[in-house]
C-alpha cells in the first residue's frame, strides 16, 4: 500500500499522533510506529485502506470490524493490546501498544549472536507464554488461525521481555457458531493444520497445530514442510512429520510434546490447557535441557535470511515504487494478495476466491517477483536433508524446473563479476524526472539534449530505473544494512558526505575519475592474459580502495596496527566507540598501503601509530580490504569475578587501552573478536544495586577498552597456581592447601565436581532487572564475627518476614523438645538415604549424631512467603546460588583492628580468616558490611532487605532463563 493520504495524516495530527517509522508494507494496509506528542509514548498503527481491502480480498468491512471487536475483548499479558481505533471514510486506523522487539525467530538469533544461551529451557519458556495466550483465547472460543513467528513478537529488546501474540486479522469468534466453522485455506501454508488444507471444519485445535509447527521450528531451526505450496499441502495432508530425524539431540519430552501438537486428528490433538500441564512445560527446571543449541541457531539464521528477503520482495511489490512507471487510474495497485505469492509469506484468507496459489499471477508485473520467491522456496528445499531421502521427489522436481536453473545461473554470473556495485541513496526515478523537466525547460535544446530526452523516455530505461530503485530502496534497504556511524560529532567527522567510492565502493576497472559515472566496463578485458606472477598485483589493484575522513581533534583514531614478516601493515583491532568504529571506514584485517600518500611498507608499528596520532585535517588511507565477513555484534553484561589492573599486566598489547576493574564490577562486553582480549565498557562498581553507578567513570569509558578473555585469565591463573605449588614453603601454597581442606567441611559431595575449578572464575553473565524478589538471605563471615546473633535478632524482630530452616538430626529428642519445632528427628538410615539422594544442603556429625539442613525445609519457607535466612559455610552457595533459591549474599566482614585492643590475638585471627574468605569467595558476594557495631549492622541489613525488592539488580542470566 502506498503512503497515507494527506487527509489521513491530518486526521492523525488532530489526535496529536505523528508517524515516526514504517514497520511493514502490505497490499492494503501499512504498519507504522507513531508517537503521541503530549505523553511522548510510542504506539503501533495499522492503517487499512478500505477500498484496497475490498478490491484485493473481495470481503466486506465487517471483517475489519470483527478483528477490532476481538482485539478489544482480549486483555492478556501475552497478547498485543489494542489501545484505540480511528475511523474515516476511506481508512480504519487501529492503534496497538508499542513493541520494540523483533519476532521470536529474529530475536533468538540476535540474542545468540550477542552471546546468550539458546536452549530447550528458553524454548520452553516462550512456548509456555504462547500456550498461555492461546488458552486464554480458546477459553473464549476465539481461534487465531494465523499463528506463526511473524505474529509472535517480543515486547521489547530487554532479555526478560515477554512474548506477545498479535496479528488477529483472520481470527474468528466461534462462541456463537458451535465452536467450529467451515472455511477455506486460511493462514500461511507451512503453518496450516491438515483440516484447514482439506477445507474441513476448523476449531481452536487448528491453532495448536500451528503452534506445534512453531515449536518444531524453534527446536530444529527449520520448518517441517518445505517446497512449493502444492508440495507443502501434499505433505501436510500426509502428516509426514519426521520429528526424530530433525531433532536427534532434543529431549524425548520435548519431542513428545511436538508429536502431540502435530497430531493429524484434531479430536486427539492436545489442547492448550493440556499442553501447559505437559512435563516439558510445567517442569522445565528438570525436563528442559540448558545446553546451547548452536546447530539450531545456524539453521534458524538461514530461515530468517530467506524470510527477510521474501519480506523485502513482497514489501517492494506492495510499495508505491513498483507502479511508478505504469500508473493506472482504473485498476488496483499491483500486489501479491490472498495467497497469490509463493512460499507462504502472505496470509491466505479462505473466504476469498483465489486462495490456492496453484498458478502464477496473471499480472505480468508480478511474474518476475513470483519466480524469485519460488526459487527461494526451491533453495530451501535443496537445503533440507529430507529432500534427498529415498522415495522423495523434491530434488528431481527442482532439478527439472528450468526457471530455477536459470536464476541460479544468473546468480553465479553475478558473483563471478570482478567488482561490486556502488550503492547510493539517490532516488534514480526522481533524478530521471528532474532531468526530463530541465530538458523540457530549455528554449533551444541541443541535439544531444533531445537524444538524452529520448533515451530517458524509453520504456526500457524507465523500467531499469524503476527496478534499480525497488532493489536499492525496498529490497536491499541500505539504511538497514549500513553499519551505522553512531556518533557524528562535528569536531571528529566531516559533515560533508564522502563520495561513494571513498566509503567502501570498489573502483571499477577502467574508471578514470571519481563520481557516479564511469567509462564502460568491457568484461572481455577481465580475461586478458597476464603472467601468473602478476596475478596477485592485478588482484590488489582491482580491490584497491580509498578511505577518507576528517580528524580535527586530539581524539585517538581507536585502531591498533600490526606489521607482518614481509613488512606489510594490517589493521589488528578496532576499538568500539572510537573514531574509526563510528565511521565504519576500516575493518579488522584490512591492509593499509598508504597514509596521506606516504607508503607504510617496512615501517615499525610505533612509527605508524605516531603518524596516526599526529595526523590532522583530511586523512586518506589507501587500503586493500580483507573482505572478511564482519563478526556478529556482541553486547552482553558480565560481573567481574577477579581484580584487574592493566598497568600491571605484562601480556596486554596496550596498557593504555585496558580497563581496570574490581571483583563485582559490572562490565558490558562489546566484542569477542580477539580470542585473548575482549573489548568492554565499564558500567557500574560493586555493589551494583539500585541506580547508583560510577557515572564519572562510565562517561570516561564511552570508548571500549581491553579486558582479558576468560580463556586467557584461566590460563594465567592456572600458571600462577602451578608456580606456587612448586615451592612448598611459600605461604600462598599453604593458603591453597588450607582452602582445599576447607572445602571438605559440611560440603555436599554431589555438587563438588561442578566446582572443581573454583579458582578459575573469570566473568559471570548477568542481566539487569528493574525489580526482583530474593527468596533467601545468606550471611557469610568468619566464625565469631556475629552472624548467629544477627540472624536471631532479625527473626525475633520480623517473624513474619524471616524464618530459619529447622535442622534434621538422628539423635533422640530431649525433654521438652518437639518434633518439627526444635528439630526434625529422623533415623540414621533415613538421613543417610536422603544424603545419598542429595537432599541436604549441608550436614555433619556431633557426638555420634548427625545434623543437617534439608533443602525441602528451605523450599517450605519460600512457599510460606517468608525469606529463608541462613548462616552457612561458603561452599553451600554452590547449591543455593540458583533461581530456585535466589539468594542475596551478605558478607559480614571483621572490623579493622585500628584503635582496638587485642591481648590474646583473637581479633587478628578473626580478621585474617575474614580476609581469606573474601579472597576465596568474594566473587559470590552481593553486599559487604563491616561489623564495627552489631546494632548498626543489623539496622543496615533491615533497611537493605526492606528496599531490595524495588531496586534494580544485576542477576545471573541463568536465574532468568
From Swiss-Prot:
PANTHER family: MEMBRANE-ASSOCIATED GUANYLATE KINASE MAGUK (PTHR23122). Keywords: Calmodulin-binding, Repeat, SH3 domain. It comes from Caenorhabditis elegans. GO terms for biological process: egg-laying behavior; gamma-aminobutyric acid receptor clustering; positive regulation of vulval development; post-embryonic development; protein localization; protein localization to basolateral plasma membrane; regulation of neurotransmitter secretion. Pfam families: Guanylate_kin, L27, PDZ, Pkinase, SH3_1. This is Protein lin-2. InterPro entries: GK/Ca_channel_bsu (IPR008145), Guanylate_kin-like_dom (IPR008144), Guanylate_kinase_CS (IPR020590), Kinase-like_dom_sf (IPR011009), L27_C (IPR014775), L27_dom (IPR004172), MAGUK (IPR050716), P-loop_NTPase (IPR027417). Gene3D superfamilies: 2.30.42.10, L27 domain, P-loop containing nucleotide triphosphate hydrolases, Phosphorylase Kinase, domain 1, SH3 Domains, Transferase(Phosphotransferase) domain 1. Residues 310-320 are annotated as: Calmodulin-binding. Residues 774-946 form the Guanylate kinase-like domain. One of its GO terms (molecular function) is protein tyrosine kinase activity.
Amino acid at each position: 500500500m502506498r503512503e497515507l493520504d494527506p487527509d489521513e495524516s491530518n486526521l492523525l495530527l488532530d489526535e496529536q499522533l505523528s508517524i515516526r517509522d514504517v514497520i511493514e508494507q502490505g497490499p492494503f494496509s501499512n504498519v507504522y510506529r507513531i508517537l503521541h506528542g503530549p505523553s511522548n509514548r510510542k504506539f503501533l498503527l495499522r492503517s487499512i485502506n478500505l477500498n484496497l481491502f475490498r478490491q484485493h480480498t473481495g470481503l466486506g468491512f465487517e471483517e475489519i470490524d470483527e478483528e477490532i471487536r476481538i482485539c478489544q475483548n482480549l486483555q492478556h499479558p501475552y497478547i498485543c493490546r489494542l489501545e484505540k481505533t480511528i475511523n474515516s471514510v476511506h481508512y480504519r486506523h487501529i492503534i496497538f501498544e508499542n513493541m520494540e522487539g523483533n519476532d521470536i525467530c529474529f530475536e533468538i538469533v540476535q540474542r545468540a549472536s550477542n552471546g546468550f544461551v539458546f536452549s530447550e529451557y528458553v524454548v520452553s519458556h516462550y512456548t509456555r507464554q504462547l500456550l498461555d495466550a492461546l488458552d486464554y483465547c480458546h477459553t473464549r472460543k476465539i481461534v487465531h488461525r494465523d499463528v506463526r513467528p511473524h505474529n509472535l513478537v517480543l515486547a521489547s529488546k530487554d532479555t526478560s521481555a515477554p512474548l506477545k501474540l498479535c496479528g488477529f486479522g483472520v481470527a474468528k469468534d466461534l462462541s456463537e457458531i458451535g465452536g467450529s466453522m467451515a472455511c477455506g485455506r486460511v493462514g500461511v501454508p507451512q503453518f496450516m493444520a491438515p483440516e484447514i488444507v482439506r477445507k474441513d471444519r476448523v476449531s481452536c485445535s487448528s491453532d495448536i497445530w500451528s503452534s506445534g509447527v512453531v515449536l518444531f521450528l524453534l527446536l530444529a531451526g527449520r520448518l517441517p514442510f518445505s517446497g512449493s505450496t502444492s508440495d507443502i499441502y501434499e505433505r501436510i495432508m500426509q502428516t509426514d512429520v519426521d520429528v526424530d530425524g530433525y531433532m536427534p539431540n532434543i529431549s524425548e519430552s520435548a519431542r513428545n510434546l511436538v508429536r502431540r501438537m502435530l497430531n493429524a486428528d484434531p479430536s486427539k490433538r492436545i489442547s492448550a490447557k493440556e499442553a501447559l500441564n505437559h512435563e516439558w512445560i510445567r517442569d522445565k527446571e528438570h525436563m528442559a535441557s540448558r545446553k546451547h543449541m548452536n546447530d539450531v541457531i545456524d539453521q534458524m539464521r538461514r530461515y530468517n535470511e530467506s524470510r527477510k528477503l521474501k519480506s523485502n520482495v513482497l514489501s517492494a511489490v506492495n510499495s508505491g515504487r513498483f507502479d511508478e512507471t505504469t500508473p493506472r487510474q482504473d485498476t488496483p495497485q499491483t500486489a501479491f494478495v490472498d495467497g497469490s505469492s509463493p512460499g507462504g509469506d502472505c496470509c491466505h484468507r479462505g473466504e476469498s476466491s483465489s486462495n490456492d496459489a496453484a498458478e502464477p499471477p496473471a499480472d505480468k508485473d508480478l511474474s518476475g517477483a513470483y519466480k524469485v520467491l519460488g526459487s527461494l522456496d526451491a533453495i530451501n528445499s535443496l537445503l533440507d536433508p529430507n529432500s534427498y531421502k529415498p522415495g522423495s521427489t523434491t530434488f528431481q522436481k527442482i532439478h527439472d524446473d528450468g526457471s530455477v536453473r536459470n536464476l541460479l545461473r544468473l546468480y553465479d554470473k553475478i558473483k563471478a563479476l570482478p567488482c561490486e556495485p556502488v550503492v547510493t541513496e539517490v532516488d534514480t526515478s526522481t533524478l530521471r524526472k528532474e532531468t526530463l523537466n530541465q530538458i523540457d525547460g530549455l528554449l533551444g535544446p541541443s541535439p544531444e539534449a533531445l537524444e538524452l530526452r529520448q533515451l530517458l523516455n524509453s520504456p526500457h530505461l524507465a523500467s531499469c530505473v524503476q527496478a534499480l530503485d525497488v532493489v536499492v530502496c525496498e529490497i536491499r534497504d541500505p539504511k538497514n544494512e549500513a553499519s551505522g556511524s553512531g556518533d557524528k560529532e562535528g569536531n571528529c567527522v566531516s559533515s560533508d558526505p564522502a563520495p561513494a567510492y571513498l566509503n567502501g565502493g570498489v573502483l571499477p576497472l577502467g574508471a578514470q575519475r571519481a563520481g557516479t559515472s564511469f567509462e564502460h566496463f568491457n568484461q572481455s578485458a577481465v580475461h586478458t592474459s597476464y603472467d601468473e606472477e602478476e596475478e596477485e598485483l592485478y588482484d590488489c589493484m582491482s580491490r584497491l580502495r580509498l578511505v577518507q575522513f576528517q580528524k580535527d581533534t586530539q581524539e585517538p583514531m581507536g585502531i591498533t596496527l600490526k606489521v607482518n614478516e614481509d613488512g606489510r601493515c594490517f589493521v589488528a583491532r578496532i576499538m568500539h566507540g572510537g573514531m574509526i568504529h563510528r565511521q565504519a571506514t576500516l575493518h579488522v584485517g584490512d591492509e593499509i598501503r598508504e597514509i596521506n600518500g606516504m607508503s607504510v611498507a617496512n615501517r615499525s608499528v610505533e612509527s605508524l601509530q605516531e603518524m596516526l596520532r599526529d595526523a590532522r585535517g583530511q586523512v586518506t588511507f589507501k587500503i586493500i580490504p580483507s573482505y572478511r565477513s564482519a563478526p556478529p555484534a556482541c553486547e552482553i553484561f558480565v560481573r567481574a569475578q577477579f581484580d584487574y589492573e592493566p598497568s600491571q599486566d605484562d601480556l596486554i598489547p596496550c596498557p593504555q587501552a585496558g580497563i581496570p576493574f574490581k571483583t563485582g564490577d559490572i562490565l558490558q562486553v562489546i566484542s569477542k573478536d580477539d580470542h585473548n582480549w575482549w573489548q568492554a565498557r565499564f558500567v557500574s562498581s560493586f555493589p551494583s544495586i539500585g541506580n547508583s553507578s560510577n557515572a564519572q567513570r562510565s562517561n570516561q569509558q564511552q570508548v571500549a577498552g581491553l579486558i582479558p578473555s576468560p580463556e586467557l585469565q584461566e590460563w594465567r591463573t592456572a600458571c600462577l597456581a602451578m608456580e606456587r605449588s612448586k615451592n612448598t614453603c611459600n605461604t600462598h601454597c599453604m593458603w591453597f592447601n588450607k582452602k582445599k581442606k576447607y572445602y571438605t567441611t559440611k560440603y555436599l559431595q554431589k555438587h563438588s565436581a561442578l566446582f572443581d575449578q573454583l579458582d578459575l572464575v573469570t566473568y559471570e553473565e548477568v542481566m539487569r532487572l528493574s525489580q526482583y524478589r530474593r527468596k533467601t538471605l545468606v550471611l557469610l563471615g568468619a566464625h565469631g564475627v556475629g552472624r548467629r546473633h544477627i540472624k536471631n535478632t532479625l527473626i525475633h524482630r520480623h517473624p513474619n518476614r524471616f524464618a530459619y530452616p529447622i535442622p534434621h538430626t538422628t539423635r533422640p529428642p530431649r525433654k521438652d523438645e518437639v518434633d518439627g519445632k526444635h528439630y526434625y528427628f529422623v533415623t540414621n538410615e533415613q538421613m543417610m538415604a536422603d544424603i545419598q539422594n542429595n537432599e541436604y544442603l549441608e550436614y555433619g556429625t556431633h557426638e555420634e549424631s548427625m545434623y543437617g539442613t534439608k533443602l525441602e525445609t528451605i523450599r517450605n519457607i519460600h512457599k510460606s512467603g517468608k525469606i529463608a535466612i541462613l548462616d552457612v559455610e561458603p561452599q553451600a552457595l554452590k547449591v543455593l546460588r540458583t533461581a530456585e533459591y535466589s539468594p542475596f549474599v551478605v558478607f559480614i566482614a571483621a572490623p579493622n583492628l585500628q584503635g582496638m585492643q587485642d591481648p590474646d590475638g583473637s581479633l587478628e585471627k578473626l580478621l585474617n580468616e575474614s580476609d581469606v574468605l573474601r579472597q576465596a569467595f568474594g566473587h559470590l558476594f552481593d553486599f559487604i558490611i563491616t561489623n564495627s557495631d552489631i546494632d548498626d549492622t543489623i539496622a543496615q541489613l533491615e533497611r537493605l532487605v526492606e528496599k531490595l525488592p524495588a531496586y534494580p539488580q544485576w542477576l545471573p542470566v541463568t536465574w532468568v532463563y
